[in-house]
Amino acid sequence: QQVIWSKVATDLVDNQELKRWAYERKQNDVGRVVSNFGGFQSSDILPKDNSQIDILVEHLDKEVNWCSQQVGLPEMQITNIWLNINPPGSYNHLHNHVGAVFSGVYYVHGEENQGNIQFERMDGAESFLPEYVAKQTYYSASRATYPCKTNGLYIFPGWLKHSVQGNQSNIDRISISFNYETKS
């Protein structure tokens, strides 16, 4: 079974301010290409780069450490956080976050047709399931898809392969991604 925590975090941060800052950051940051095709992925955001990001990180620290506690792991600390702007047609290919215990994404702006996040279990477990498991569930499925939506927060194991479907709208999808490791 896949382990993905999700919630809608309304009124957590000022998304309008984050959108404004995202486009400003894009103008002043060469960015990087990791899993993004056609989109912008910023360099790492540092503490005090943006007050709304700092507020978000405080919240993420609590959420990730709650998840860590649920699965019997020690306290976690953020290792990096970055901005994604995915215009129409862009997507993120299948990847994982090497070295991260937990990873996640917060949607500053996300709506229908902007590309859902997909998690893939590539262990072949479905071939061991009995033939009578006709209906796919989170237990039996090799892929789980979660909607792209404003204020959506997803936290998952860093080793879990995932991708983001292509943005089929005419509006940019804006998200903040992050990684956590064991606190030193």
Where are the regions that the model predicts?
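A short coil-to-beta-strand element that immediately follows conserved catalytic motifs
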Residues: G72-I81
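Non-heme Fe(II)/2-oxoglutarate
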Residues: Q1-L73, R173, Y180-S184
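Short beta-strand His + acidic residue motifs that chelate non-heme Fe in jelly-roll/DSBH
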Residues: N92-H95, H162-S169
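Catalytic core of non-heme Fe(II) oxygenases with the double-stranded beta-helix
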Residues: N86-I155, T182
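Preference for bulky hydrophobic residues occupying beta-strand positions
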Residues: S6, L83, Y106, F178-Y180
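Residue-level detector of short, conserved catalytic/binding motifs and their immediate flanks
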Residues: I81, F102, I174
